[in-house]
Amino acid sequence: MVNEKFVTAHYENKDLFEMIEQGLKALAVDLGNVRIEDLSPVDEFHLGGADGTRFVIEELKKVKKGEFLDVGCGLGGPARHISKVLDRKIKGIDLTPSFVRYGNKLSDLVGEKDSVDLIQGSALDTPFASDTFDAAYMVHVGMNIDKKVELFEEVKRLLKPQSLFIIYDVMAVGTQPIDYPVPWASNESESAVENLENYCKYLEQVGFTVTKSQLLAEFAKRFIEQTIEKRKIQGIAPLGLHLLLGETADIKMRNVFDQVLKGSLAPGLIVAQAP
């Protein structure tokens, strides 16, 4: 069973905001005029980065109004991206205090504090009222939550009838054991990776109707190949996911890249409709 305290400890970093500011300065970004795009190398913490978020945006375009829920929002990068593109208000919830604290500061920094509001808490037991949101999504979150049926029950409770729930997670392909550490877990006890079929089964078990489910393996492989080539040419950028991953960033990224390239892991996209 994945312990939420261990998950929080895996991500918590009290110096993160200062590190992001230093990275922006190193890139000659004016801290008084920071754009959402300037933050995407560090706050779009998932395979594909901003391009990965666009898969979610394409599905959320079908929702013409209302407020969205970001389940496991992290620093709020996808929330700010989605809010800007679709002009929606977004609530986010995440376990990690520093992600929420600094995520709200980053929203203020880019002028999105009135549109994106992040709170600290468990996605399994949120403080929101039932039938509150017009859509929900989660981006690379389920790998840390083994109680997926309980999670999907809670999301269903929060959604208005017939609302969409979009999932973009790292998923298992086949039965090959995962090599750790990876970006979401230092070891197996922190990880809850499952395959696409199980995600769909759990969603349908609690009453969702799955309208789309697909693995985005080729997209992820292209992204990884481009990332590796760019790093060979440019070296490590001042602002990037290494700020979130700490001293073991290289091996975490190498392990997940290798496993996606060999086909044992892939990002999966699911669109489900609440009852």
Residue positions per predicted region:
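Short, glycine-/aromatic-enriched active-site segment of Class I SAM-dependent methyltransferases
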Residues: 170-190
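A short acidic, Gly/Pro-enriched loop at the edge of an enzyme's catalytic core
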Residues: 124-135
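A short SAM/SAH-binding and catalytic strip from SAM-dependent methyltransferases
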Residues: 134-147
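Class I SAM-dependent methyltransferase SAM/SAH-binding core
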Residues: 67-125
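Conserved alpha-helix/loop element of class I SAM-dependent methyltransferases that forms part
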Residues: 29-32, 46-66
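N-terminal auxiliary segments of SAM/dcSAM-dependent transferases
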Residues: 1-25
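A short glycine-rich, Lys/Arg-flanked "PGG" loop and its adjoining helix->strand segment in the class I
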Residues: 149-164
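Conserved Class I S-adenosyl-L-methionine
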Residues: 212-275
